[in-house]
Amino acid sequence: MPSLLLVVVAALLSSWAQLLTDANSWWSLALNPVQRPEMFIIGAQPVCSQLPGLSPGQRKLCQLYQEHMSYIGEGAKTGIRECQHQFRQRRWNCSTVDNTSVFGRVMQIGSRETAFTYAVSAAGVVNAISRACREGELSTCGCSRAARPKDLPRDWLWGGCGDNVEYGYRFAKEFVDAREREKNFAKGSEEQGRALMNLQNNEAGRRAVYKMADVACKCHGVSGSCSLKTCWLQLAEFRKVGDRLKEKYDSAAAMRITRQGKLELANSRFNQPTPEDLVYVDPSPDYCLRNETTGSLGTQGRLCNKTSEGMDGCELMCCGRGYDRFKSVQVERCHCRFHWCCFVRCKKCTEVVDQYVCK
């Protein structure tokens, strides 16, 4: 009997490990440094087999495009940082855990937060690959070949080395979507609904980067007269991409899977989402309390703002449990003076301030 129990427990642990692996665990490239291209032999499969969290399709792409992998890791890291910035004042603050799932069990729930995380990480990959192309780091791409904008003045030159957002978009689509596309779920199943949700949000993230890329120009001429301009395509600051996706998070559409294997609005009174919108299939879990099942870390010990009425305020952040006050010593630059020529000298001032943490 004990041996049978051990078998059952082992099976449950195995299936749970598989669930964690099935999460979007290519994100783990952000936490594990990927060797630079010059550090390994082109076509050497062991390098890709040693990278944690890749699906079979992603592993094949790794073998074909090994020099891209460090930039995929950079893109994932950029996405995680932006997620943590955007949610820094929310109950769920995009915390990472120390395993290949990166965000833990909370990503197994098809919530708004999961939708944002998929979108912003896909956006990070587009951003990193596009820039690597421009900087000459990848052998398969170079500067942007985007067509000259029709509204660009005739006497302005088009052809500076721009960010190759077209290539970045295409490669990110092929790599990031591989995990969802290589699976064959039963039509109308919850698993298929979740896969379609992930694909929609991946696309929304990529499109945010693609659509927000804009023309940048540099002046040429005697004494800065700007008699001539050279222009190129340039990525938007990633913070602006994050802001755009946060707006999409706030207006994300609740969806459900149909028997025909398509996502439809859970409430038909709302507008159909566009490819640039975020969607979700599950309600968000309770982020107030720590819950091992849902992966919620809770808000106990989180800093809160006593005077704010927003999500960062102690009343909302602490979910009505109350908060503790403690004294904190902060060191800041003060009494700064400009000295000729040319530097600024400051003193260091210490201040004891009250801070508050959730019970």
From Swiss-Prot:
Gene Ontology MF: a single term: signaling receptor binding
Cysteine-cysteine disulfides: 83-94, 133-141, 143-161, 217-231, 219-226, 288-319, 304-314, 318-358, 334-349, 336-346, 341-342
Record's subcellular location: Secreted, Extracellular space, Extracellular matrix
GO CC annotation: cell surface; endoplasmic reticulum lumen; extracellular matrix; extracellular region
Keywords tagged on the record: Developmental protein, Disulfide bond, Extracellular matrix, Glycoprotein, Lipoprotein, Secreted, Signal, Wnt signaling pathway
Keyword Heme: no
Post-translational modification: Palmitoleoylation is required for efficient binding to frizzled receptors. Depalmitoleoylation leads to Wnt signaling pathway inhibition.
Principal cellular location given in the protein's record: secreted
Biological process, per Gene Ontology: animal organ morphogenesis; cell-cell signaling; chondrocyte differentiation; muscle cell differentiation; negative regulation of canonical Wnt signaling pathway; positive regulation of cell migration; positive regulation of convergent extension involved in gastrulation; positive regulation of fat cell differentiation
Lipidated positions per record (O-palmitoleoyl serine): 223
Source superkingdom: Eukaryota
Signal peptide positions on this chain: 1-17
Glycosylation-annotated residues: 93, 99, 291, 305
PANTHER family: PROTEIN WNT-5B (PTHR12027:SF87), WNT RELATED (PTHR12027)
Task of the protein: Ligand for members of the frizzled family of seven transmembrane receptors. Probable developmental protein. May be a signaling molecule which affects the development of discrete regions of tissues. Is likely to signal over only few cell diameters.
Record's subunit section: Interacts with PORCN.
Family from the record: Belongs to the Wnt family.
Protein name: Protein Wnt-5b
The species this protein was found in: Mus musculus (Mouse)
